[in-house]
Amino acid sequence: MAKRSKGRSRTAATVGAQAPAPDSALVAVRYIESSALVSALLERDADALKSIRSKIKPITSALTFAEAARAIVRARVAERLTPDAERAAVRALRRFERRCYVVSITDDVLTRVRRPFPVEPVRTLDAVHLATAESLGELPQLITIVTRDDRVRDNAKALGYSVE
């Protein structure tokens, strides 16, 4: 079972910060948003897979696992996945969850979701991801948000986060 936070999230030192390679930016936190995980699991997106498999311990919202599991179910029902491919995707999702730091959807996150974001409109579930990243308590410069969603990408950049 993945670790769940009770309140404020851990600092960079406790979630796997690494010394930067020469000429690279320091990334203390890598937040994996649902679209990137789904892209890695179902589309085998090489860039998403690389980001998700980074040596930096990934952080994500508890919401991510519900969204990814639903995407797997939808793909199977639409016959875009064989039963074997569905089982493989579910196993990969479970492996990812075991190595993640999972952030609960707290009252603070939900309160933030109610306020405007820099680039509107933002869908509610996307706002939950953005608010979760903000709740980590790290400087935006120390957080990279891994996403395949344009609205999340645009807002993350506007909020000062690095984006992959």
Task: For the regions a language model picked out, list residue spans one by one.
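Active-site neighborhoods of divalent-metal-dependent phosphate/nucleic-acid chemistry enzymes
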Residues: A2-S9, G16, P20, R99-R151
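Short, function-defining helix-loop hinge/capping sites that tune catalysis or transport
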Residues: L41-E43, E134, K157
